[in-house]
Amino acid sequence: MTQDELKQAVAKAAVDHIAPHLEPSSIVGVGTGSTANFFIDYLAEYRNDFDGAVASSEATAERLKKHGIPVYDLNAVNEIEFYVDGADETNESLELIKGGGGALTREKIVAAVAKTFICIADESKQVGILGEFPLPVEVIPMARSHVGREIVKLGGDPVYRDGFVTDNGNIIIDIHNMDISRPLVVEEKLNNIVGVVTNGLFARRPADLLLLGTRDGVKSIARGA
């Protein structure tokens, strides 16, 4: 199977997982990226079975609307039953690196609200220790140099994502060669830097369920199992 076929398989598995639980009042949180896009396409088949969605990016909102799925502002909903999103890396504890597409802050907010966070990924994203994929950090523009210096103090190599602006109007610094053997500690240290909005480590709020696309089919891995 190609990587796209693996992504399609896990996206369909996620829809199959949540479909029996959808009610007319249900709100589904939807992530950003290529795997999330496949999820949206499959979710559209059930658009009459639930109320609507909360999107983690403008691009996701646009795709949902094209399928006729109502998109709500997060402040307008009381709860989100499921949040489904991809990842750039995942470890065995279902701690993640996300934000390759630059939507990490909104993704982290929606994940924090959701009762169940389902991560969908192909097997290339599963790693022993996080950090081979550069760790994105969303930064207030005027703090760019300061944050970069602080990242160096923590042992990382900061690289400005030139020309990229987040949906929130901020910039991204990608951290290379960072020791992330203790994801929760690193997440908190980075978030404590003045000028950082948030970083792409999902350790305080890891996934509850990982649907992993492999050559042998989709594996379902629950956190703590």
UniProtKB/Swiss-Prot annotation:
Kindly state which reaction or reactions the protein catalyses: aldehydo-D-ribose 5-phosphate = D-ribulose 5-phosphate
Q: Is Secreted among the key words of this record?
A: no
Pathway where it operates: Carbohydrate degradation; pentose phosphate pathway; D-ribose 5-phosphate from D-ribulose 5-phosphate (non-oxidative stage): step 1/1
**A GO BP term, please?**
D-ribose metabolic process
EC number, as in UniProt: 5.3.1.6
Q: Which Gene3D superfamilies match?
A: 3.30.70.260, 3.40.50.1360
Sites where the protein binds substrate: T32, G33, S34, T35, D85, G86, A87, D88, K98, G99, G100, G101, K125
Tell me the active site: E107
**Entry keywords, A to Z:** Isomerase
Xref: Pfam families: Rib_5-P_isom_A (PF06026)
Q: Which SUPFAM superfamilies match?
A: D-ribose-5-phosphate isomerase (RpiA), lid domain, NagB/RpiA/CoA transferase-like
The molecular function GO annotations come to: ribose-5-phosphate isomerase activity
Q: Name one GO cellular component term.
A: cytosol
Do the record's keywords include Isomerase?
Answer: yes
The cross-references to CDD domains, in alphabetical order and at most eight, read: RPI_A (cd01398)
Q: What class of enzyme is it?
A: isomerase
Signal peptide position in this chain? none
Q: Which family does it belong to?
A: Belongs to the ribose 5-phosphate isomerase family.
* Known function: Catalyzes the reversible conversion of ribose-5-phosphate to ribulose 5-phosphate.
Q: Subunit structure of this entry?
A: Homodimer.
Q: What is this protein called?
A: Ribose-5-phosphate isomerase A
The organism is Marinobacter nauticus (strain ATCC 700491 / DSM 11845 / VT8)
Gene, per the UniProt record: rpiA
